[in-house]
Amino acid sequence: MSKLFNSRLADVIRKPVITEKATNALDFNQYTFEVDHRAAKPQIKAAIEALFSVKVIGVNTMNPPRRTRRVGKFSGKRSQVKKAIVRLAEGDKIQLFPES
């Protein structure tokens, strides 16, 4: 059983993921964010709706295993990363890039 993640909604969303795949998903009104690894889908949905004033249709999450990193003979682990793909309602938009 997982522990509940009790925090402010602003702490759930870390940053947007800007890759080629995530940029192509913008055409389908899907936005990709890096979120806290303890956050659940309802918390992610509530955070996106509160921070950006949009209507969220669906949330898909990816929680890959931590990657190991080696420096010389010392081995360590990178921080846990969880990604959320958020699908917005028709007509809603999130401004990720500044217009110039």
Curated annotation (Swiss-Prot):
Family according to the record: Belongs to the universal ribosomal protein uL23 family.
Source domain of life: Bacteria
Signal peptide (UniProt feature, chain positions): none
The keyword Nucleotide-binding appears for this protein: no
UniProt keyword Glycosyltransferase present: no
Protein name: Large ribosomal subunit protein uL23
Single GO biological process annotation from the record: translation
Pfam families named among the record's database cross-references: Ribosomal_L23
Keywords: Ribonucleoprotein, Ribosomal protein, RNA-binding, rRNA-binding
A single Gene Ontology CC term: ribonucleoprotein complex
Gene Ontology MF annotations: rRNA binding; structural constituent of ribosome
Organism: Prochlorococcus marinus (strain MIT 9301)
Physiological role: One of the early assembly proteins it binds 23S rRNA. One of the proteins that surrounds the polypeptide exit tunnel on the outside of the ribosome. Forms the main docking site for trigger factor binding to the ribosome.
Quaternary organization: Part of the 50S ribosomal subunit. Contacts protein L29, and trigger factor when it is bound to the ribosome.
